[in-house]
Amino acid sequence: AGWQMADEYLSGDVRAKLRMAQFAAETNPEFVVNVDALTKAQPRELEASEIDVRLGATWLAPEILQKFMTETFQIPYYLRHAVKVRYSPYTAEWRVEGKTATGRGDIISSETYGTSRANAYKILEETLNLKDVRIYDTIEDTEGKPKRVLNKRETMLAQQKQQVIKDAFANWVWQDPQRRIALVKQYNELFNSTRPREYD
């Protein structure tokens, strides 16, 4: 690959470079010096308290969000196969399948985390797609054609529940020690691997 200046080699994605150097050092001891230098050049690991994990972050696995939804909205066991969180990398959109599976009698999704017009699953889906929930009514215009108008009161109520869901996620995400370790590691790998070049 040729020679590189130390300041260039010890900058950029130093985590990936360290993995490559460690692999090379397994068969060629000359690379041990690279491993040592790159180990010292690694960025400081961020801790959970320094990481802001938000609903809708595309780096979160759907399984994490599924677990949050299942635990927080207390989905009955017999319905867990029907209510799923999915992410499409093609459209960059989150979908909650089975939004109406629990029915209107579900107090948690229709009152605690939702409203009579937007249940918790609909609000979660909007939140995952980084949208503010909006509730519309259909009325007839002067020509008798249907027209959608924003229902300000219902929208305000739904947006309050949206904030309740965001707060619940912020409290939930770091509670489990294994989940915390996995998410911190994943975040550091994805977003804390780069070191700026320092010119000598």
Set out the residue ranges of the language-model regions.
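ASCE P-loop NTPase motor core, strongest for the SF2 helicase catalytic module
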Residues: 189-200
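Charged, low-complexity intrinsically disordered regions
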Residues: 1-186, 191
